[in-house]
Every structure is written in C-alpha cells, then in structure tokens.
Regions:
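N-terminal export signals
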Residues: 7-21
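Bilobed "Venus flytrap"/periplasmic-binding protein-like clamshell domains
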Residues: 25-54, 87, 110-177, 187, ...
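Periplasmic-binding protein-like
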Residues: 29-33, 106-115, 203-241, 255-274
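Short beta-strand-to-loop elements that line the ligand-binding cleft
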Residues: 59-65, 163-172, 210-213
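Short helices/loops that flank or line small-molecule/ion binding pockets
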Residues: 68-82, 95, 129, 173-193
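Acidic, polar ligand-binding/catalytic clefts
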Residues: 71-130
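A ligand-binding cleft/hinge motif common to bilobed small-molecule-binding domains
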Residues: 86-96, 153-156, 181, 186-206
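Ligand-binding clefts/hinges and TM-proximal coupling segments of bilobed small-molecule sensing domains
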Residues: 138-153, 241-284
Length: 284
C-alpha cells in the first residue's frame, strides 16, 4: 500500500464525521396552498431549498394534503420547520409548543382576509340573511380562513352554520373556488390571497364568483419550528428567512410574497382567542 493510500484511509473517518452531520436532512413541510401537490411543491420548494442551504443540510420537503395534517406532523416531531397557516400554527403550539419564527409578508403586508364567495347570479344583498338555506363548502378544520374564522364570526352572530346552511367541509381552497365557479355549491370559504392567485393563474375568471363577506385583517402565515429543535438551528433558520429581501423573494418565494418579519409573542393572539371561543383549544 502506498503512503498516500495509507494517509487517505487514515483520514477517512475524520472526513466522514462532518459529512454525516451535514447529511441530516432538514425536514420541512408546507400546506396545500396550490390546486395540486405538484403545484405547491414547484411554488414553495425554492424557498425551502434556500433554508436548507443556509443551514448546510439536504432538503426533505413534504407537501401535506390538508391544513390539520401539517400541525400534527409538527407536533409529532416528524417535521422540523413548516410554512403553515395561522390556525395550524396555533394548533401545533397548543398541542406541542411549536414556535413561530417569522410572519410572511404578501405584497409588503403581514396580514390578509378570510372571505366567503358566492355564485354571481345569486341575489344576496344582505349576508348572511339572504343566504340562509343555501349550500356552503368550508375548508378543512385546520384552515384559518376556510374554517376557524368563518365559524368564529358566525358564532358572534348567533348562527350555527351547520344548521343555517346546507353545510359541508373538508375541501381545499382552490377546490372551493372551483366548486362555486362551476355551480356545485352556492357559497364557499376562501381567503383573498388565494382568490387573487387563482384569477392571476387563469384557473378562474373574476366574473365567476363574487365576495359576500370579508373578515377583519388576519396575521399572515407562520414559519414555525417544532419544540426542542436545536437552538442554533432555530436561530439560523430565523436569520435565513428574515434575510430575504423583496428582490430575493421574487426569485425564491411564490408570486407576490415579499419576505418575512419577526414573529412577536402576540402575533397570533387573535387566532388563538378565536380557537378558544369555538372550543377547539383549551379554555374555550
């Protein structure tokens, strides 16, 4: 055996140690923001690739099929970091002490609105009075704008949507939009960002639906991490997200997202209060 060969073999264990450390995947997850899982992966993978590269790890990205599932995965420590809706984050925080690192900005704003859309031919001058008895599709129970906030608002009006309407739930937001546009249901829950994205992508025409209700401004999606994540990794992820400026966001984030701002202790307080009010987390 040559001296060079012996030297290489002697160094091999030392070289393998950092390689193994760097080979631990960063387990990321994102909810069903786009019409299909493939669409969501294509839109959000560049952002998660940026995070993984920033912390020196390979990427393992999961696209969930519903909003509740992403909260469960984070709570069960199957995921390290997730881009998730506000209500999903609160569920994971309540169940397993998940922590929000940052709040996403959309067109420079950290807020959005829940909406209820209707078929454009329906005579709805007053909502919900004129819509009583109509069919309505809610999103799954892990959705902020598609489930929690509409349920909470109806509760403040003394209305149970399950008996006031012909009620169903469990749909994705894109599916809700298309169900209204094609006349499968009269009404559906959604959020303003999604409706705008569907129209911009040509999946929906603006004249195929009309908005009959809007919520107050809600905090945008969270970049959240699981409990007991290494503090150094958590700090590096936060810095990687907050370091994205508008120019970088245009390359690595979906259209119209412009970066992140730090999450504060009260960033999602209104979502947590709504969850308690409808009895979905403790203290309601």
């Amino acid at each position: 055996m040559t001296p060079t060969r012996r030297l290489f073999l002697g160094l091999a264990p030392l070289l393998a140690a950092p390689a193994l450390a760097q080979g631990t995947p960063l387990r990321c997850a994102v909810g069903p923001f786009q019409p299909t899982a493939g669409d969501t992966r294509r839109a959000y993978e560049p952002f998660f690739t940026h995070l993984a590269r920033a912390v020196g790890r390979p990427l393992d990205l999961t696209v969930t099929t519903d909003w509740a599932g992403i909260a469960v995965a984070l709570a069960n420590e199957q995921v390290d970091v997730a881009w998730m809706g506000p209500w999903g984050y609160i569920l994971a925080k309540d169940r397993a002490k998940a922590e929000a690192l940052a709040v996403v900005q959309y067109q420079g704003k950290p807020t959005y609105q829940a909406i209820i859309i209707a078929r454009p031919d329906l005579a709805i001058a007053r909502f919900p009075e004129d819509a009583k008895g109509m069919s309505i599709s809610f999103a799954d129970a892990g959705s902020t704008s598609g489930w929690l906030i509409p349920h909470y608002w109806f509760r403040t009006q003394g209305i149970d949507p399950r008996s006031y309407f012909r009620y169903r739930d469990g749909a994705s937001h894109p599916a809700n939009d298309l169900a209204v546009a094609t006349g499968q249901v009269d009404l559906a829950t959604d959020y303003d960002r999604n409706l705008a994205a569907m129209i911009a992508a040509g999946r929906l025409r603006e004249d195929q639906v009309k908005i009959v209700w809007r919520s107050e401004p809600l905090p945008n999606d969270a970049l959240a991490v699981r409990d007991r994540l290494d503090p150094g990794l958590k700090s590096a992820l936060r810095e990687a997200a907050l370091g994205i400026d508008a120019a970088s966001a245009s390359r690595i984030m979906p259209a119209n997202y412009t970066g992140w701002v730090p999450a504060q202790p009260d960033s999602y307080a209104m979502i947590e209060a709504a969850g308690r009010a409808v009895g979905r987390i403790g203290g309601g």
